[in-house]
């Protein structure tokens, strides 16, 4: 079974969000199950030179884009037993950032066409083409509408994964007409048209044989108006080919037993070493070294989606408790400035690191006691899974993948691995934080809760089995 992942980013090459983690980890897990996965992505100038040096020029072809042919170099390399193809074109991919350019519609129209034009030259018979998010959604659409009659492509099945419905790739109609050479028959509400523009993600949803969302709850949520980003009706229409498969974490990267970034490695039976990580974290940030004061942390993009309006509303009430708070992330200036002001107002309790630091993030996961993730919506979420693996108990809102992976602690049965609240309400969140702090001070309960969190399986194994089953069903 041969699968080709078409992605716009992938660890270890380049990363801007969770898509890169999925693209980097899932193929390795599928390989263990006997599924051959190869990955195709743009050859961005941002890719570290040592990784590009590990690739060789496999082939040079021309890609038809509207009225002109564009250069396409196919570079081939291998990392961790997985074969990668990098699509080389400096005009489109020699940029200082992955996305956010005036010509993104053209850039990813080119990449979508390039993926399809490359397939006969890869020395790899593709059974299933698996595209991800808006950037490669049109690969599946163009395959069905323009390439499927060609004997080289007619057997290929398609899967499309929605990682975040909020970002859809909406562009002026000229992109469809001039670059993708699609006529008026595609510019209506049953096809690519979207409020006077063209919507790439819509194309992926319509044309793919199967669609997955990155958690079962998110799969249900996006069929409702509140979460559906104006595509809820379309997703209800194609509900029969929509499924939800929760993401995992790469346990070769996120594992407190082997993590070289943390001060002391530990497992569920050596939690005293977790306390050493807590002390190291307090020293790093210049916080008082108080073993019995819980550290509440957030490692996040500082955006509205992450529920920061709730945090902002009740932050001073949380500060009335004997807690320490560490924020690591960057994003909207209003949230950055708020947390910097809180660090100024509460210098003995609040520390903020604006930006991202991979090594420090690992130490925050290892050294914290509680991990706050009160998202407005969360397709899957990676932070809560990492926190659980490190025995840092998550406090989450019951949405998307947070609802699927965090079970609220039940004091009657002792079951659960975290704390959760339902409504997007600041005082509901505050009540849940206070409840978590209360149980933190009951050491026997807390130790049991931490052990339960750490002994569950958050790897990609179950997810990979589900994807293998999905691929197999398409080929039967």
Swiss-Prot record:
| SUPFAM superfamilies reported for this sequence | UDP-Glycosyltransferase/glycogen phosphorylase
**So which residues are the signal peptide here?**
none
Q: Could you confirm whether the keyword Plastid appears in this record?
A: no
- The UniProt record gives the binding positions of ADP-alpha-D-glucose as 15
Q: Which reaction does it catalyse?
A: [(1->4)-alpha-D-glucosyl](n) + ADP-alpha-D-glucose = [(1->4)-alpha-D-glucosyl](n+1) + ADP + H(+)
Its domain of life reads: Bacteria
Q: What EC number(s) is this enzyme filed under?
A: 2.4.1.21
Q: Key word Isomerase present in the record?
A: no
Pathway(s) the chain acts in: Glycan biosynthesis; glycogen biosynthesis
InterPro entries given in the database record: Glyco_trans_1, GS/SS, Starch_synth_cat_dom
- Record's keyword terms, sorted: Glycogen biosynthesis, Glycosyltransferase, Transferase
The record describes the protein's role as: Synthesizes alpha-1,4-glucan chains using ADP-glucose.
Q: Which family does it belong to?
A: Belongs to the glycosyltransferase 1 family. Bacterial/plant glycogen synthase subfamily.
> Could you identify this protein by its name?
Glycogen synthase
């Amino acid at each position: 079974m041969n699968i080709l992942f078409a992605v716009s980013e992938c660890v270890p090459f380049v990363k801007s969000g969770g898509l890169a983690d999925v693209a980097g980890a899932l193929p390795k897990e599928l390989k263990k199950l006997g599924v051959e996965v190869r990955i195709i992505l743009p050859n961005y100038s941002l890719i570290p030179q040592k990784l590009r040096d590990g690739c060789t020029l496999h082939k040079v072809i021309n890609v038809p884009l509207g009225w002109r042919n564009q250069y396409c170099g196919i570079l081939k390399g291998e990392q961790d037993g997985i074969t990668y193809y990098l699509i080389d074109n400096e005009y489109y991919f020699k940029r200082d950032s992955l996305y956010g350019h005036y010509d993104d519609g053209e850039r990813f129209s080119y990449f979508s066409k390039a993926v399809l034009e490359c397939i006969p030259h890869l020395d790899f018979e593709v059974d299933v083409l698996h595209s991800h998010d808006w950037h490669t959604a049109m690969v599946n659409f163009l395959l069905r509408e323009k390439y499927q009659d060609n004997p080289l492509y007619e057997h290929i099945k398609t899967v499309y994964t929605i990682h975040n419905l909020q970002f859809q790739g909406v562009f002026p109609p000229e992109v469809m007409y001039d670059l993708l050479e699609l006529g008026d028959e595609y510019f209506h509400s049953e096809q690519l048209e979207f409020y006077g523009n063209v919507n790439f993600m819509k194309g992926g949803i319509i044309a793919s044989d199967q669609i997955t969302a990155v958690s079962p709850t998110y799969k249900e949520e996006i069929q409702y108006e509140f979460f559906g980003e104006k595509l809820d009706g379309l997703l209800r229409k194609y509900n029969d080919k929509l499924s939800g498969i929760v993401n995992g974490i790469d346990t070769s990267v996120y594992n407190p037993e082997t993590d070289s970034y943390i001060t002391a490695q530990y497992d569920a039976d050596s939690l005293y070493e977790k306390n050493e990580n807590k002390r190291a974290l307090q020293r790093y940030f210049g916080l008082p070294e108080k073993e019995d004061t819980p550290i509440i942390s957030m490692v996040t993009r500082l955006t509205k989606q992450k529920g920061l309006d709730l945090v902002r509303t009740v932050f001073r009430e949380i500060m009335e408790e004997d807690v320490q708070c560490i924020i690591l992330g960057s994003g909207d200036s209003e949230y950055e400035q708020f947390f910097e002001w809180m660090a100024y107002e509460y210098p003995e309790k609040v520390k903020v690191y604006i930006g991202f630091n991979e090594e420090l993030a690992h130490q925050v996961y290892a050294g914290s006691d509680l991990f706050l993730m009160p998202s407005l919506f969360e397709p899957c979420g990676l932070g809560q899974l990492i926190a659980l693996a490190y025995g840092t108990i998550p406090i989450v809102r019951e949405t998307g993948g947070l609802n699927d992976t965090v079970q609220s602690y039940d004091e009657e049965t002792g079951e659960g691995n975290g704390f959760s609240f339902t409504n997007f309400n600041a005082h509901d969140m505050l009540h849940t934080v206070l409840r978590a702090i209360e149980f933190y001070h009951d050491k026997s309960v807390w130790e049991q809760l931490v052990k339960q969190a750490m002994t569950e399986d958050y790897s990609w194994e179950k997810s990979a089995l589900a994807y293998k089953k999905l691929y197999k069903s398409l080929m039967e």
